[in-house]
Amino acid sequence: MNKATEMLSRWQRQRLDTVHANRTDYGHGPDSVTVLAYYWGADVEKPDTFFYRIESAFRETWLHCGMMKSVIVTDRPTKELLSFAQKFPCVEIQIEPSLIPGNLYTMSADCDGKFADRFSTDYLMVIQDDGFPLRSGLEEFLGKWDFIGPPYVRDKFFPRLIARMFNLWTANGGFSIRSKRMCDMAQKYWREIYHAYPDCHAVGEDAYYTETLLRRHREYRRTMKMADCRSAIRFAYDCVVEQPVKSLPFGFHRAETFVFFANRGWIQI
């Protein structure tokens, strides 16, 4: 665990012990959104060592957005996971045996080919233990786009011009919102073509939804509305691609991004 992850983890533990202690009601969130996270690859002998991190991600999401239908996709049920779902009836555990610990391709394959079957609402908000909302404002990002996530298009004139011309707004999927119709179409292409692909960039979950399908399939490119960079930066930031972030976005992805916000005083730690 690096220093950035340690800082985020300490903050998550502190919040669970204070803000979220004994709390079971976060109010009602939008009925049009399902929240989903993966919980897999944990240590076989101590599977719940880091469960507090995914619990924190869900609780922070509910705190800022209200309680919504919530799905946890896992390779196996664990004691803490089952206890969490029992405490919060809005949480559904979905067992996926194809998830292999340490193999990111198996998660990407599930995102690419099975997302559409994992929810029935208009939108899916994907969160991770290092990617979730930090403030209220979810409604601003619903009903306008089929995908919004931390932008990976660089803050330069020509990259953004090309993105605007061809609707190629490459983005991170670890913390994102995507529409049901996008997931339906992505699943269709997966079953027809991409299920046969080996582990490669084209089928990595981020690239598949925001790059591969946009470049290779006219129907997808013409149908799907991707959030532009300016809107995406208000939604979330991932510091792997530098962007002109001037205030706290709705959420974040990556522990290093969390530290970036903390160093600017946007998060109290």
Where are these regions (language model features)?
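Short beta-strand/turn micro-motifs composed of small residues
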Residues: A37-G41, I72-R76, G149
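Short beta-strand-to-loop acidic/aromatic patch adjacent to the donor-nucleotide binding site
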Residues: S120-P133
